[in-house]
Amino acid sequence: MGTEGPPPPAASRGRQGCLLVPARTKTTIALLYDEESENAYDIRLKLTKEVLTIQKQDVVCVGGSHQGRNRRTVTLRRQPVGGLGLSIKGGSEHNVPVVISKIFEDQAADQTGMLFVGDAVLQVNGIHVENATHEEVVHLLRNAGDEVTITVEYLREAPAFLKLPLGSPGPSSDHSSGASSPLFDSGLHLNGNSSTTAPSSPSSPIAKDPRYEKRWLDTLSVPLSMARISRYKAGTEKLRWNAFEVLALDGVSSGILRFYTAQDGTDWLRAVSANIRELTLQNMKMANKCCSPSDQVVHMGWVNEKLQGADSSQTFRPKFLALKGPSFYVFSTPPVSTFDWVRAERTYHLCEVLFKVHKFWLTEDCWLQANLYLGLQDFDFEDQRPYCFSIVAGHGKSHVFNVELGSELAMWEKSFQRATFMEVQRTGSRTYMCSWQGEMLCFTVDFALGFTCFESKTKNVLWRFKFSQLKGSSDDGKTRVKLLFQNLDTKQIETKELEFQDLRAVLHCIHSFIAAKVASVDPGFMDSQSLARKYMYSS
């Protein structure tokens, strides 16, 4: 149930474990939860670099002429000491078959080599008992005489409430006296109403042919390339406690994976996320081989977008985001070929997009607190989901996105900064049409020169200021902005008022260029301003 491979590197500051480190291989026992029946079934998870495999236990014939057959008919000879040598649980009153819950070592059931904990009892001496109550099956087995022939089949999805052991059963207390209960072991290792107490021959067959074994068998493999994780119940804002679901690119779902401890759940959420992230990086490298140096993919991955004006029962839906070259893309499904990049739902110019950490908070839920938190002390419960960020584009268009881990939020913040700064340095400048008092002008934001305003027809420069001369600004929230510059000679503040068709895009562009300029002078400045990363590494 551990993980193999090197330990994660220490974080640069503060506590360790903030970075997602891919797991080579990882296995554990978990539960597969069925939301319709509200039952959970024991499974084994196996994580490799590229695939998450769900395994279920089954009984298989590994020798003889019945190889592969699960259904078995076995004759038990009741012994003077130990009886049938097994206990049962379940019954139709709980909508589950009666199953063998214990097999006692060296007693009748164990000697056959054909019966296993988890076997569902289908027939007793030819009588079908699939729909029988617990008490009815107990009565049949106790009063069946010295020889009892039972037909069984391994129940691959035994509800967890039956509490069947996964390993070799050990001795247990005897519940055979008094009234039997479908959720407790009814001991059949004592004598029933047999006609004799003389020693009997061992139960058959004692030969090793056929030979049966209980094994973990692969039942589902979920490819992790471009897969996504969901911790929320479908169609709601209800967080699944200590559970999550993995959905492959083709829609195949792992089902709801529930873990026995919060620490296990956290470890597996981080491990699966890390492997998905590693495969995404490989896909980015492949895509970048086909792209020019100015059109490289900087970051991409799954998020959940908050729907505008949506019904409160379902306010988020999955989206795939990408930062590539000069653009920010919003997809409904990931781009897997060069041609897919033209089918984005939305495309925005990076220089005209404002990114900010929108909402992230903690709860008392240890599932969130176990290695997932950012360390914030100011909690805000306005939104139902933590780890949200906002994207505000031109004309006031905005999106709110949510990610599953705090480390993912920090990665998106860092990647937006990097992609924007790269684009600012590549383009060097951006020019916008504007007007003032009826005159058409051009306004240029230049990485090297700062701000320039000139006449659109004559190209005559009206004024020019450096970034450092901008001391403040104000706008009407619609089209007009006032820029306050300090004259280097007079030290006086000069106000320049302009009107733009898309004021929001211009303001975001100014912000992008100034931030990139500051970062070029002081590379550590943006890290100090990063809200998510600041709390990721704080103690």
Curated annotation (Swiss-Prot):
Keyword Cytoplasm part of the UniProt annotation: yes
GO biological process: central nervous system development
Disordered: annotated segments: 168-209
Bias kind Low complexity: ranges: 168-183, 194-205
SMART domains in alphabetical order: PDZ
Localization terms from the record: Cell membrane, Sarcolemma; Cytoplasm, Cytoskeleton
GO MF entry, a single one: actin binding
Function: Adapter protein that binds to and probably organizes the subcellular localization of a variety of proteins. May link various receptors to the actin cytoskeleton and the dystrophin glycoprotein complex.
Assigned protein family: Belongs to the syntrophin family.
Subunit record text: Interacts with the dystrophin protein DMD and related proteins DTNA and DTNB.
Protein name as catalogued: Gamma-2-syntrophin
Natural source organism: Homo sapiens (Human)
